[in-house]
């Protein structure tokens, strides 16, 4: 979620538990095929009643031809209706033919994510969720780097150094998230400098060193890498 808001899209009916999670997030709106009565009442309270709640028809079928106009010129192409299923992954070209079921699930999630992400696009998936997406870049290796840095940050947020941060009670969730992002990056002194950290942390944390980050990242395994087209050069890998 963006610190300044985002739209949330759900593929199933929004229930009460999901609505409670959404209610505390900075968000501009939600779209779903339906809402339970209690969930709808919770979401109506968000943004003093100005929160966008959209219901989509789950039976809607888009037109087979997509059209876009650019300065009076109409471009059209067939809609991407590729059915992503296990058959797409049946041709295993590596020496090792044994792929765990969990990896096959992550591969399908990667393909679904990339199907609806602006090209060029690359994503990393782990344990059933996309942990890093790089999209809309002219160079595929730039997509890989962008997605990889997001995946690294996702895992670094689970490190003992980050989980042990003690924030001042008055700091909001969005500001905490931003402080964590800066703390993990190269500009960490922006939150650790004297006169600054006191407004963020109860106790000044030590620098999260490059060596410590590398050691933690080396523990990450079972990550799936996906691309919306072939990798033209081995440097992406």
Which role does the model predict for each range below?
Residues 1-237:
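ATP-dependent carboxylate/acyl-activation modules
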């Amino acid at each position: 979620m963006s610190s300044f808001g985002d739209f949330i899209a759900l593929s199933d009916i929004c229930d009460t538990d999901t609505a409670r999670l959404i209610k505390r997030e900075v968000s501009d709106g939600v779209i779903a095929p339906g809402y339970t009565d209690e969930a709808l009442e919770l979401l109506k309270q968000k943004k003093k009643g100005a929160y966008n709640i959209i219901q989509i028809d789950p039976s809607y079928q888009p037109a087979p031809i997509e059209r876009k106009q650019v300065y009076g010129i109409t471009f059209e192409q067939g809609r991407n209706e590729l059915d992503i299923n296990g058959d797409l992954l049946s041709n295993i070209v590596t020496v090792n033919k044994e792929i765990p079921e969990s990896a096959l699930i992550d591969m399908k999630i990667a393909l679904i994510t990339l199907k609806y992400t602006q090209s060029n696009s690359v994503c990393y998936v782990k344990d059933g969720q996309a942990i890093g997406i790089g999209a809309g870049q002219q160079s595929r290796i730039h997509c890989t780097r962008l997605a990889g840095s997001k995946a690294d940050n996702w895992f670094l947020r689970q490190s003992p150094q980050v989980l042990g941060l003690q924030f001042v009670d008055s700091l909001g969730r969005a500001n905490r998230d931003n402080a964590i992002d800066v703390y993990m990056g190269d500009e960490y002194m922006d939150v650790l400098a004297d006169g600054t950290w006191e407004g963020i942390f109860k106790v000044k944390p030590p620098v999260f060193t490059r060596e410590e980050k590398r050691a933690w990242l080396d523990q990450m395994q079972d990550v799936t890498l996906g691309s919306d087209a072939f990798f033209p050069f081995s440097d992406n890998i």
